[in-house]
From Swiss-Prot:
Protein name: Putative glycosyltransferase WbbK
Pfam families per UniProt: Glycos_transf_1
GO cellular-component term (any): plasma membrane
KW Cell membrane (keyword) present: yes
GO molecular function, one term: glycosyltransferase activity
UniProt-listed Gene3D superfamilies: Glycogen Phosphorylase B
Listed GO biological process terms: lipopolysaccharide biosynthetic process
Major place of residence: membrane
UniProt cross-references to InterPro entries, sorted A to Z: Glyco_trans_1
Purpose: May be a glycosyltransferase involved in the transfer of UDP-GalF and UDP-glucose.
Domain of life: Bacteria
Membrane-related topology note: Peripheral membrane protein
This protein's encoding gene: wbbK
């Protein structure tokens, strides 16, 4: 059997979580016998030194527009797959490329097509999200049945894909969450928690319309008379129209602290000094703060959706609320403060106990490179 040539397409990943996904995937490709890896990226500047066994090909212009992106996926990639003699092709960013290879895979992580009840206000504040919702369902569909396997992060998305696209070769590939080395309180944390009796509630999220910051502001307003409860939110109001709107909703609230963007060390500090991680988001592929809160043993108050229940699984220090009901959230916070919040032993993953699941990028890369 000849050497396999695996092409990893990630031209759209440049920053944040998606770029982290690319780096974790590349790290998992090391020491694979009879396999060479080629990565198609926006820029290889930050990657070459860390992953010397990978050949990088740069496409800096592709991210410039959707037309360039689609031309790349459906025209350039076909030509490239022939020139590289690729045997395997994995698209890490949702679109199934038009290629000529023995094996073809796509990693689908954008849940926008499945967002329900988008409001006109949300469309005005983040029109790009509305376009994603409308177009991504169609983009997912193109070539999807030509894949050897389709990877998603959760079973709820697998069920959506089965229903919408009539395919059965969907593999759940979950991220492996590991705590950073800094997991203990430091002196720097004192700037946030001067009063040990204070109840601190943390919500780390970028300002997107589906993140549902409004619910936290509404709950904070109803709790404003209780001086020993405060909320830490990771927006500043300067990021976009939605962030500015949230700041305006919180006018006059002393119990809400807008911290802006935080680096990983400061995020860790906020987790450490928080009593509750609140997660009112209406849409996620996974919900990283849920996993990070679990790893730290924090109480989690989360919106009641399949993705939150699946991510939290059998974790007992959890409680759920309707994402449109601030009174439910307020009650949970008060119950916690009084010591009346009961642990939840339910496990949404129990029904999937007999399903095959890939955990972490090592297992994902092994699945791709092994014969099936």
């Amino acid at each position: 059997m000849g050497k396999s040539i695996v092409v990893v397409s990630a031209v759209n990943f440049t920053t944040g979580g998606p770029f982290t996904i690319l780096k974790k995937f590349l790290a998992a490709t090391n020491n694979k016998e009879n396999v060479s890896f080629i990565a198609l990226v926006h820029s290889a500047k930050e990657l070459k030194e860390s992953y010397p066994w990978v050949k990088f090909i740069e496409f800096p212009e592709v991210k410039g527009s959707w037309l360039k992106r689609l031309h790349f996926e459906y025209v350039v990639c076909k030509k490239l797959s022939k020139e590289l003699n690729a045997t395997h092709w994995i698209c890490l960013h949702d679109i199934t490329a038009n290629v000529v290879t023995k094996k073809r895979y796509v990693y689908c992580h954008n849940p926008a097509p499945f967002y329900k009840g988008i409001l006109f206000r949300e469309i005005l504040m983040e029109p790009s999200f509305f376009l994603f919702k409308m177009l991504y369902g169609l983009i997912y569909k193109i070539n999807i049945k030509k894949n050897t396997a389709v990877f998603v992060q959760q079973f709820w998305m697998k069920e959506k894909f089965i229903k919408k696209y009539s395919i059965n070769n969907i593999i759940v590939s979950r991220p492996e969450i590991k705590l950073s080395d800094k997991s203990q309180l430091t002196d720097d944390d004192s700037q946030f928690k001067n009063n040990p009796s204070e109840l601190t509630i943390f919500y780390p999220a970028v300002p997107r319309v589906f993140k549902n910051y409004e619910l936290i502001i509404s709950a904070a307003r109803k709790l404003k008379e209780q001086s020993n409860i405060k909320f830490l939110l990771t927006i500043s109001g300067t990021e976009n129209a939605y962030a500015k709107y949230i700041i305006s909703l919180a006018e006059g609230l002393d119990n809400v602290h807008f911290l802006g963007y935080l680096d990983k060390e400061k995020i860790d500090h906020c987790y450490n000094i928080s009593d509750i991680v609140c997660f009112p988001s209406r849409l996620e592929t996974w919900g990283l703060p849920l996993s990070e809160a679990k790893e730290r043993g924090k109480w989690v108050l989360a919106s009641d959706f399949p993705f939150t229940r699946e991510t939290l699984g059998s974790y007992e220090k959890k409680a759920f609320f309707d994402s449109n009901n601030d009174d439910m959230l307020v009650k949970l916070i008060i119950d916690f403060k009084k010591g009346n919040l009961k642990k939840d032993i339910s496990d949404a993953n129990f029904i999937y106990r007999n399903e095959n699941v890939l955990v972490g990028f090592d297992e994902l890369v092994n699945f791709i490179t092994e014969e099936h």
